[in-house]
């Protein structure tokens, strides 16, 4: 009986040690792949920067929020550009390669001609964290090259699909001269065509120094934009690009900016 008890205790002890080791391994993996990259907020970046602000808006003084659109260019983008132009506003467009830049280079050219800010949103919209380093770099570099061919300029901003990033992605972005931009407001406009609901979700979440994420390719989004602009301006917000929100700080390659 004593031998049986000792055996049982040994098994329990081994199981406990194994569980602890597994938990430590998971924690270490998460620490290495998720949290070990540099990140800051737009406000913190501004506070550390010195000098004057280029452009007409100083977000250190104004109540700013950045407006950004993912997933274009698409057939709905020109209508959005018309709205922004009518209101004298600029936004940041994180554009995609396959099915977008490749299919609608003329629309991308207009985005640039209208003075809108252009960022990189990968070629095929994969989770970059799931790819090996070579494939992840290819997703971004191919899109950089395509944007440059059409507009003559390479972006300095990117947005990782689904907001998923890690140390590997940060390393690649630093090498390619790209700062990473996340968001604080999402209307989840990919799951609804209800423009009123999209508007409500944006207004409910918006705060000073936030970054709004919308997708101009979805049916309900562009019709919601005029109401969003009007309501935010009535609340005292100034709508700006991501770079204007950061100014006088300059986007730092590899850095993750999240409000």
Tell me the role of every PLM-derived stretch.
Residues 71-75, 97-101, 118, 124-127, ...:
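Solvent-exposed loop/turn segments at secondary-structure junctions
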Residues 16-33, 117, 181-183, 206, ...:
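Hydrophobic alpha-helical membrane segments, chiefly transmembrane helices and signal peptide h-regions
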Residues 2-21:
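N-terminal export and membrane-targeting signals
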Residues 126-154, 162-208, 221-223:
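Alpha-helical scaffold elements lining the catalytic groove of polysaccharide deacetylases
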Residues 65-68, 91-95, 117-120, 156-159, ...:
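Structural recognition of the beta-strand scaffold that forms the well-ordered cores
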Residues 43-131, 135, 139, 144-146, ...:
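Active-site beta->alpha N-cap acidic-glycine motif
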Residues 51-59, 87, 100, 220-259:
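C-terminal domain-boundary segment and adjacent tail
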Residues 26-48:
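C-terminal region of N-terminal signal peptides and the immediate post-cleavage residues
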